[in-house]
């Protein structure tokens, strides 16, 4: 039996919005497998949806450059928001991004090696660890970029108006699509969601045959919700992004979205445990 920790229960609660006891029970039944617990909670109606894994906890910046025919995003991390605004840290981050733009195709390993000496010197000066974490390139006839407070960076590639593509980049920053078009959603992702929706319908009392027919309509809605062109446009929710693009004679071929600290989880201090430790367990 896997250990069901308080942090695991908290993560499940954060991702599903369900109560603490429901989350603990679901984790026990799933033997600590949080993804299985989420699926089971959705099937039973305890959770309507779940946020994607990977809490954003690390600090740092996302920077972007657009050159002729391509764009690049660079993520540089540090430990605190204070250092993320430091002139020395930002200076190095900009230097790294300029180098990446001037040397298209540079790998993250090569980028880290190129600036290791300067990084180490800045760490010694500031007294806080930092690292060049990610670099991502995007090719395209027209490239638009959007930075949201240096915490989210988006590149959108396509054809047509750069100004209209920038609006789409702003949409990507806000709505986090996973695919460009509904038909791009992988068969594996679709089938996984389809099975969950069938179980939800069956658990609500519908016969299997009827449940399967009901789900077909839901799956079209699902693929639209996770794809860029199928989503409601944030600047005009009455139309989809796809319809907006058609109206301005513009198309999107691909996009990249990076957010500071994706997939990195800072160690959170357990306040109650710390108090118990200090007081000898008598708190």
UniProtKB/Swiss-Prot annotation:
GO molecular function: translation elongation factor activity
BP-aspect Gene Ontology terms: translational elongation
Keywords tagged on the record: Cytoplasm, Elongation factor, Protein biosynthesis
Cytoplasm keyword on record: yes
Pfam family of the protein (one): EF_TS
GO CC aspect terms: cytoplasm
Subcellular location: Cytoplasm
Signal peptide span: none
Broad class of the protein's primary localization: cytoplasm
Ranges where the record places region Involved in Mg(2+) ion dislocation from EF-Tu: 80-83
PROSITE patterns referenced in this protein's UniProt entry, alphabetically: EF_TS_1, EF_TS_2
Family: Belongs to the EF-Ts family.
Record's function text: Associates with the EF-Tu.GDP complex and induces the exchange of GDP to GTP. It remains bound to the aminoacyl-tRNA.EF-Tu.GTP complex up to the GTP hydrolysis stage on the ribosome.
Name used for this protein in its record: Elongation factor Ts
Organism: Haemophilus influenzae (strain ATCC 51907 / DSM 11121 / KW20 / Rd)
């Amino acid at each position: 039996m896997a250990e069901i920790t308080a942090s695991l229960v908290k993560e499940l609660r954060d991702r599903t919005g369900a109560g603490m006891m429901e989350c603990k029970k679901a984790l026990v039944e799933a033997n600590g497998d949080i993804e299985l617990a989420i699926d089971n909670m959705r099937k039973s109606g305890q959770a309507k949806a779940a946020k994607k894994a990977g809490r954003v906890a690390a600090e740092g910046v996302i920077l972007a450059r657009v050159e002729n025919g391509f764009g690049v995003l660079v993520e540089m991390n540090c430990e605190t928001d204070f250092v993320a605004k430091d002139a020395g840290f930002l200076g190095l981050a900009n230097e790294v991004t300029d180098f990446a733009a001037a040397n298209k195709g540079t790998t993250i390993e090569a980028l880290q090696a190129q600036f290791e000496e300067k990084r180490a010197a800045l760490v010694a000066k500031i007294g806080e660890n930092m690292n060049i974490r990610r670099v991502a390139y995007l090719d395209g006839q027209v490239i638009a970029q959007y930075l949201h407070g240096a915490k989210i960076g988006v590149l959108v590639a396509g054809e047509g108006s750069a100004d209209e593509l920038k609006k789409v980049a702003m949409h990507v920053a806000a709505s986090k699509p996973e695919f460009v078009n509904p038909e791009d959603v992988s068969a594996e992702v679709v089938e996984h969601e389809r099975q969950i929706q069938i179980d939800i319908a069956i658990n609500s009392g519908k016969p299997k045959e009827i449940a399967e027919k009901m789900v077909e309509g839901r799956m079209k809605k699902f693929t639209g919700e996770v794809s860029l062109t199928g989503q409601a446009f944030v600047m005009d929710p009455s139309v989809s992004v796809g319809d907006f693009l058609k109206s301005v004679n513009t198309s999107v071929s691909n996009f990249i979205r990076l957010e500071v600290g994706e997939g990195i989880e800072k160690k959170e201090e357990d306040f109650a445990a710390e108090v118990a430790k200090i007081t000898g367990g008598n708190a």
